[in-house]
Amino acid sequence: MKYMLLICRDEEAWAKLSTAERQDVYGGTLKLAEELTARGQYLAGSPLHLSSAATSVRIREGKQLVTDGPFAETREQLGGYMLIDVPDLDDAIAIASRVPLARTSTVEVRPVREGPPS
């Protein structure tokens, strides 16, 4: 089953990390992705630019509303994702717990709905 790991981080805390600390996070994430790829479980993933680079689009009463930044003002913002294919939720949780940012941030595990919406 496919799962999306949504990696949310506190952007202010991320900005305070040293270059070495950030490289440690990136290196650990790359190592995990390489391991999952070798097992055929890694489908896609990438870090995202800061939320200040985001654009939100909404349609209200037939009108397009475009705003700079994320839709919600929260401390943690979506900072990256991993799409994995594993047998079950327990395996997805085990992988999410190995994402380096899980130690200081949040990794949301969400099953991917396949096929037409029901």
PLM feature spans:
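Conserved, structured core segments of small domains
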Residues: 1-118
